[in-house]
UniProtKB/Swiss-Prot annotation:
GO terms for cellular component: extracellular space. Keywords: Gamma-carboxyglutamic acid, Glycoprotein, Hormone, Phosphoprotein, Secreted, Signal, Sulfation, Thyroid hormone, Transport. Pfam families: Transthyretin. The modification 4-carboxyglutamate is found at E60. GO terms for molecular function: hormone activity; thyroid hormone binding. Belongs to the transthyretin family. Residues 1-20 form the signal peptide. InterPro entries: Thyroxine_BS, Transthyretin/HIU_hydrolase, Transthyretin/HIU_hydrolase_d, Transthyretin/HIU_hydrolase_sf, Transthyretin_CS. The modification Phosphoserine is found at S70. GO terms for biological process: purine nucleobase metabolic process. L-thyroxine binds at K33, E72, S135. This is Transthyretin. Sulfonation of the reactive cysteine Cys-28 enhances the stability of the native conformation of TTR, avoiding misassembly of the protein leading to amyloid formation.
């Protein structure tokens, strides 16, 4: 049974990463993609907040939105606004699981990263969710690719 679950998790991850490809990424400097590992489907309507670290080390609201039917969130920012800095992406996983009638362990998923320190890049933040665990990864690419 455990090997069956591991196989399904790996398969979901493979599908997830293959879908996190260049569809909307070429136009968006920051894109978020979320997959529900329990149901093996996109995580729809996950609230996403993006913050930028200020000079005084506080977090300032930068952008927000909800994932679509494909589990993706595009159009969070523009190349002009997405300047070099430290950013935090917060996924409201508790509300997502509560909507499905599941009581989760985590309140939210947080990904903190430095962006554009080596020139302008495209960032895809990907998250694979379950009620008691999560995994994140990032795809960073040159906008000319």
């Amino acid at each position: 049974m455990a090997s069956h679950r591991l196989f399904l998790l790996c398969l979901a991850g493979l599908v997830f990463m293959s879908e996190a490809g260049p569809t909307g990424q070429s136009k968006c400097p920051l894109m978020v993609k979320v997959l529900d590992a329990v149901r093996g489907s996109p995580a729809v309507n996950v609230a996403v907040k993006v913050f930028k670290k200020a000079a005084d080390e506080t977090w300032e609201p930068f952008a927000s939105g909800k994932t679509s039917e494909s589990g993706e969130l595009h159009g969070l920012t523009t190349d002009e606004k997405f300047v070099e800095g430290v950013y935090k992406v917060e996924l409201d996983t508790k509300s997502y699981w509560k909507t499905l009638g599941i009581s989760p362990f985590h309140e939210y998923v947080e990904v903190v990263f430095t962006a554009n320190d080596s020139g302008q890049r495209r960032y895809t933040i990907a998250a694979l969710l379950s009620p008691y665990s999560y995994s994140t990864t990032a795809l960073v690419s040159d906008p000319k690719e």
